[in-house]
Amino acid sequence: MTFESARPDDFNEIQNLYWDLIDKSKDEPSFPDWKKGEHPSSDFLMQNIANNQLLILRDEGIIKACAIVNSISNKEYANVSWQVKEKGNNVWILHALAIRFEYRGMGLGTLLVKHILSYAKAKNIEAIHLDVIDKNTLADKLYIKAGFKYISTENIFYEVVGTREFRMYEYMI
């Protein structure tokens, strides 16, 4: 299994990974209310691929997991009492972590997060911030297990879900 940045020719496979996951898990209690074509959008995926910010786990030629890390956050992040404050490019935001549907429950989320944390350390990142939508208890468990600290619960507006409660997590590198 390799950890790497996605390439432009990975776009279709990554988009299909998200769309298949949405189709097959939308009725599950922890589903984060992603919508095909809206979140993650094609433009969002392509932009992050172009910037080497879409990270993947590839095994035997198949992308089994992916996530986005960049410094783009929702405006409400500025109101959170983070232990490490953003001052330029010292903090990454973790977005849209997804595991290919048929490979869920195999520890790939944990493996991907561990690789991201190691990569962040190598890039001299001081902290990783993220938010988890109110009902996504599976993501809460993943991030807590990986060492992220719960910071607060905030009302955040995202176009795809409206204003909802999100739990804010931080990992200090």
Residue ranges and their predicted role:
Residues 68-96, 104, 159-160:
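Conserved acyl-donor/pantetheine-binding loop and adjacent beta-alpha core of acyl/acetyltransferases
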Residues 133-137, 145-146, 156-173:
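C-terminal "cap" of GNAT-fold acetyltransferases
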Residues 23-43:
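Conserved GNAT-fold acetyl-CoA-binding loop/helix
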Residues 51-67:
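Conserved beta-hairpin
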Residues 113, 120-131:
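Conserved GNAT acetyl-CoA-binding A-motif
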Residues 2-16:
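A short beta-loop-alpha structural element at the N-terminal edge
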Residues 43-56, 72-76, 93:
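A short helix-loop-beta-strand connector motif used in the catalytic cores of GNAT acetyltransferases and
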Residues 99, 105-118, 141-145:
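Conserved acetyl-CoA-binding loop-helix of GNAT-fold acetyltransferases
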